[in-house]
From Swiss-Prot:
Name used for this protein in its record: Probable D-serine dehydratase
Entry annotated with the keyword Lyase: yes
EC identifiers of the protein: 4.3.1.18
Swiss-Prot/TrEMBL catalytic activity: D-serine = pyruvate + NH4(+)
Amino acid sequence: MPSVVSPQDHLQDDAPAAQLRRAEPCLWLNPHRQPIPAARQAVAGDHISLDDTEKAAARFARFAPLLEGVFPELQATGGVIESPLLPASSLHAAAGLVAGQGALWIKADHRLPVAGSIKARGGIHEVLELAERLALQHGLLTPQSDADDYRALANPAARAVFARYTVAVGSTGNLGLSIGVAASALGFHAVVHMSADAKEWKKQRLRQRGVQVVEHAGDYEGAVAAGRAQAAQDPFSHFVDDERSLSLLLGYSAAALHLRQQLRDAGIVVDAQHPLFVYLPCGVGGAPAGITFGLRQVLGAHVHCFFAEPVQSPCFMVQMMAGQGAHPSVYDWGLTNRTEADGLAVPRASLPAAELMEPLLAGCFTVCDDTLFRQLVQVLDATGERIEPSAAAGLSGPGFLTGTETGRTWLHAQGLWPHLAQATHLVWTTGGLYVPPEAYARFEERGRALG
């Protein structure tokens, strides 16, 4: 077990920690990462494996006929919730890459239907898992049920069963959208506890779909705690716990299976001579941890995942630096947790996610809000894609890795530098599809004003 280290201990000999405390962009590399991932990984007193990821993917597949009927936007995909893999060579300079440092791609979760963000993966999976469990309990499904049986869960009899139950969640925005929209569409009573960071348009989108929005004056941690406490008083309430849920995490992990096929279809090889670097925005940590777990299980030693966080809200970097046995907050480091990247405005990381990532994660880096807005505009100008500020966080990753002494030293130490020209850099964009035009116009205006 790594030692528990306080912020003060770090400041004396750890340059990234000193930069972090000054709210300066920095790169931290994980000294506990294992090159070869174990087949079974410990998390929250349990163990998970590729088998659990495949079970989550199978659940999505079973529910596809129902989802196709409930959500018109899924008719074209047969009920499959997925995002494209986009080439992004026009963003090389914006990402800090120069010629000979690999190819750049975008995993465009900002286009995910239904929820419009990466949260469609984990959030909808947990709602589906709950619906399946209740349907089995009430005789609406059997283990032998076929597509027609799942499609019938949209019928009045099934909706009457689901209507007895409440699905609740605490969120800064995107997870609330995912849970609220999916739960209400199936007939559940949906309650979303929103922190002060949540954008007004996200609250309105939920209310328009019949979701109860409870606004809190405090931060993400407070909204989650309030939602958890309220749900605990009602035996017919299911609380989706973003800080602790394995169902969420495994729902995210299923993305790795589809990405593996997308990489093959694009002719992208991932092996010792062709490393894959993945850059994932990180809030409490469940989504990027789930995806990283899935990718390490599927692609093994040759995928290297990095989490991106705002300079004022680096809760995961703080947690990874401290190690197991501690649970620090960004406030402990003199940081404010104030950022325009609302989905990343989290003061304290998920402990299960941090435990899972200790042997799997390559590192973390932080970015300024101004950088997010500049890069949002660069993405628009280069590709035409419209993303939220938080979705731009990963774009700084390649530059940290290839353009800083810390990053280059790590690449050499890992034996990756000689293979950089054959590498693939994958920036995972996390939200943007449903941003109202007037809100996006303000994002763009700020980004262009920054130059």
